[in-house]
Every structure is written in C-alpha cells, then in structure tokens.
Design a protein with these regions (language model features):
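Helix-loop-beta hinge of the Bergerat
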Residues: 103-136, 204-205, 210-227, 245
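Conserved short strand/loop->alpha-helix "switch" segment adjacent to the catalytic nucleotide/phosphoryl-transfer site
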Residues: 40, 44, 127-150
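Flexible loop/turn segments at secondary-structure boundaries
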Residues: 41-42, 202-204, 262-265
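P-loop NTPase nucleotide-binding core
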Residues: 72-116
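Conserved ATP-binding N-box helix of the HATPase_c
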Residues: 50, 139-181, 241-247
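Amphipathic alpha-helical interaction surfaces in cytosolic regulatory modules
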Residues: 4-88
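ATP-lid-like helix-loop hinge signature
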Residues: 156-206, 273-277
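Flexible, glycine-/charge-rich segments associated with ATP-binding catalytic modules
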Residues: 1-26, 87-92, 96-97, 208-215, ...
C-alpha cells in the first residue's frame, strides 16, 4: 500500500485522510509513505507521521517505508535523525557533502524517552540548547521551556505505561524557528517550537481512570487545560495549568491532539483564543506542540 502525502503546508492537519486507509492494511503488507510532493515539514507534523507509521506497523508487522523525500526535506529529517525510529525505514536521496542549505531553523535530533531518569537528562540538555540559541533571553525563558518538556514527557510516559502491550515511550524535539517577517519587524524575533508524541492511552482514558467525567476526547482536552489531575506520580496532573501560564507570559501557541479531537490555543496577555476540531478518525495517544 502506498500513501501519497499531498503538497500541503501542514501535513498534521490532514492526517485523518491517511488514517482511513489503516483498516485496509493486511498482516505482512508493506506500507510506503510517499513524500515527493511535500514542500514543508515542522516538528509537529513529523511527530504525527511517526505515530501514524507506528499504527501501520502494528497492523502489518512490517516497517513503514518513507520514500520519495525531496533533498531539502531529507536534510531536515537527517538533522532530526529520523532513521533511529525502529519501525520506519527511510529511503533518503543521495546527499552531496556540499548540500548544506542554510536557513534560519535549528533543530535537535529526535529524542526517544522511555523512563524518568532519562527525562532528567533530556531536560538538562534542553536547557543547554536554549541557552545557546537564545543568549539574549533570561534564564527564566529557558527554564519555562524546560518545564514544558518535563511536564509533557511525564504525561506521555504515564499514558504509555498504562497502555497494555506498549512500553513507555515519548518522542520529542525542539526547534529554533525564525518567522518569515522582514528584518526589523517586531514579529522577527526567533521563537522555539517543542513537539511531543506518544501512542499511549490518551487523555480521555487517563482522566477517566480517576475522575470518570470525560465523555469525549474534546472534553478530556478541555478538562486537562483547566488543570484536572490524573498522573499516577501525583506531581501536578497533566501540568497544563502551569504550562498555560508559561504560554500566556510568552504569548505562545499550543496545539493538542488526543484521539479524535484537537485544540489550537493562542495565548495573549488578556485572553486565550481556541480553535476546536473534531476528527472522524482517531490517532493513537496524544500529540502536543508548542510555539512561543
């Protein structure tokens, strides 16, 4: 089976179209995802494609092939070290040593975190990267971003541990991102993107193990944003109340998908604008992306 990723800016906004093909996959069938028409990738899209590939892998038992990758997208995926994902086989184009397309994006290799001691090291490394990328920012900014890493990865590990037959797992990456505004514009300031993904039980099942009040995936996300707790370690629930304060202070954006629902939040000093979306197909686990 071949899945053709269309020429679109945000792959993650249309992942449902690819999920529809999951039911047709047979055991032992090789699934190929064709990137030849893809012109743009961001960490959140890559994370969702990893989770999508995991779902196809679990159905077929065969590694999912990523093929037809344009050279500039291949360069980006190489920096992420996508080849370390064990259920994906990446068919990279030949790369000339001189092909070092310079741009304003800096990204750390994809991190695979499977336990909490490993999370401590990842958080410290995140602080180091942020201090290097944003030397003009205060330590509070770097600490805020590191706290987001700590809270969200803890959620993913907790959700994975509770998922039958699934080992604790969270993929995440951090990218320095330069918006495409004219130099000198007040919007030109570099920003940071942090993206996470797991294939665990998701927010609704996690919340209902303690509260039994989330009737839908959308209501579960809303409850988490209000600060409802569910994490088994007793350390602040899902941490979104704390995370929301960080985003409000930095006028950030938050996108969460869990199962069949997603919310995009834009934080300002005085308000939070939310765009809710219901999906016909359910993506495993929870995927979260931050921009601030």
């Amino acid at each position: 089976m071949e899945i053709q990723l269309k020429n679109q800016k945000y792959i993650d906004s249309n992942v449902d179209r690819y999920l529809k093909q999951l039911s047709a996959v047979k055991s032992g069938e090789r699934v190929t995802i064709d990137f030849s028409q893809v012109e743009y990738l961001r960490p959140g899209a890559v994370i969702q494609l990893i989770v999508l590939s995991k779902m196809f892998f679990e159905k077929s038992g065969e590694k999912v092939v990523w093929s037809g990758i344009p050279k500039d997208r291949a360069f980006y995926l190489r920096r992420l070290q996508i080849e370390q994902v064990e259920f994906i086989s990446v068919m990279m184009p030949p790369m000339l040593w001189a092909y070092t397309r310079r741009d304003n994006e800096t990204v750390i290799p994809l991190e695979k975190i499977t336990n909490r001691p490993q999370l401590g090291c990842a958080t410290a490394q995140a602080m180091d990267h942020l201090r290097e990328w944003f030397p003009e920012e205060s330590d509070d900014f770097c600490r805020d971003a590191a706290n987001i890493v700590m809270e969200i990865v803890n959620n993913s590990l907790d959700h994975s541990e509770r998922c039958e037959g699934n080992s604790p797992l969270c993929y995440y990456t951090i990218q320095k991102y330069q918006p495409h505004y004219p130099i000198g514009s007040k919007c030109y300031k570099p920003r940071v993107i942090i993206a996470f993904g797991d294939a665990g039980i998701g927010m609704r099942e996690s919340l209902n193990r303690r509260w039994n009040i989330a009737q839908t995936d959308m209501s579960a996300i809303e409850l988490a944003l209000k600060g409802y707790s569910c994490r088994s370690d007793g350390e602040g629930g899902m941490g979104f109340r704390r995370v929301s304060e960080v985003l409000k202070k930095n006028k950030g954006h938050l996108t969460i998908r869990s199962g069949g629902a997603s919310i995009h939040c834009v934080y300002d000093e005085d308000e939070v604008r939310r765009n809710r979306r219901y999906h016909k197909e359910r993506l495993l686990g929870t995927q979260t992306a931050f921009l601030f």
